[in-house]
Curated annotation (Swiss-Prot):
UniProt subcellular location: Cytoplasm
Lineage: Eukaryota, Fungi, Dikarya, Ascomycota, Saccharomycotina
Organism of origin: Saccharomyces cerevisiae (strain AWRI1631) (Baker's yeast)
Annotated region described as Disordered, given as residue ranges: 30-62, 252-306, 332-377, 400-481
Name this polypeptide is given: Topoisomerase I damage affected protein 11
PTM-bearing positions, type Phosphothreonine: T236
Chief place where the protein resides: cytoplasm
Residue spans of biased composition, Polar residues class: 257-287, 332-359, 368-377
Keyword Coiled coil: yes
One GO cellular component term: cytoplasm
Highest rank taxon of the organism: Eukaryota
Amino acid sequence: MNKFDEFIESNEKDLDVDTSTRNSIISMSPVRKTGRKIRSASSNGYRLEHHRTSSAGSMHSQRLMTPTRLNDQDHPLQAKPDARRVVTRHSSVSVPNAMSKRRSLIQPMVVPTTPESQNNLPSVSHSEGSYGIPLESTTVLSSEQAMASGLRRPRNGSSQSVNSMIATTIPTNGVDVSALLQSLATKELELLECKQKIEDLKKQTQHEEQNYTRRARELHELKEQVSKHLDPSLNTPVKNRAFSPVYQNIPLESRTENAGNSSLPSSVSKPKNMGHQSTNQSRSVSPQDIQERRQRDDSSDSSKQSLWSKPLALFNQFDKIIQHEIERTLNWDDSLSGTPEVQEGTPTSNSESSAQQYDNEAPGARQKSPSQGSVSRSLWSFVSDVKAGLLGIEEENDNDVITDNRCDPVYKSDRQHEQKKSTHKITNRGQAEDSGDDSSLNMRKFKTTTKFQKDNAGNNSLTDESGHRTREKKVKEVVTS
């Protein structure tokens, strides 16, 4: 036993009071002088007598019963259904802990009692029976005091428990908020890292694209170099290339005659070169492929010649018809002059006769010369005619043509005139080839108004000797009008 228990027992001995139990509801019976024993209440689980042995060895009986706990339901602190209840807060403390702390809750009160006051004390009957309390000195706790003390204690305990709960919840809430803030910061850092990674990947992709374009350019240049080494014709200029069968079969005379018309072969050869380069770029070039291609080109020369000869001949014939109609429409002063047809129509008749002679000689020339040569000549003649007739006529050589047309029709026949013109062209061909002039080539000139007036002036100067002055006057009147 400790000192506290010894102190309580000594006080109990002095006061003859048992304070071992405490209940919020106390059943009191009228105090009797006779100290008879407490009657049995075995149904409630209480012992009849509780004897204590003092230090002297004498036994004395306690006036209050000491409960013995049989089970949780028979505990004396268990609330009875018909007893008054004191509102208390149910704490989370277990029952054994409450039983161990019951001694600290004892608040003994010493109240002196007298016989008069004992008679005035109300008799409070317990639901199970009345118990006898001695008169000498007893601890009387009224129900109001017990209830007040019982209410005071739970209130204090509840306030303490609430404060303890608040103290415990605040740190937990603080921990939760800090954890949330920490998780928020980590998420923000993760997002920043992801954004930085995305930017790095974008920069890397741009760098890789630039490398890809640079390598593709280098590969293209290497392909061109390899194709140039394997195919020497690509290194030569366009004029000297021999892989074009059409350009190879064109005679040298036609090439020199049309030196000024270099735009057409260049424009024709550019698509071929582009197509050839595209084929070289699209697939790897090998010497076997080049040889096979050349063999196919050589074998297809005859088919190409027959393919292009008929359309070009038809096109040349159509061009002659158009030129004849234009010359006839430009000869507008035939109806106004009223002179004989022989004198007025000498220039046009010469051109018509030359056209007929060319038509008559063209089939023979085509039969004599190779088919490819005729096709090339007709093509270059058509180009020259278009250039001379539609783009303008070079008038610096008009005097030579006028003298030829002025002298030949009067004194020579048409056949001799054509022979003289052909000899004149042959003598001047070398000069035309060197200078690139198209005036002395085999090209037909359109009869414009100015040239026709000059021809008429020349014819009038010849016919004035025979006394024909009226024609010159009429022509001047027509021109002035």
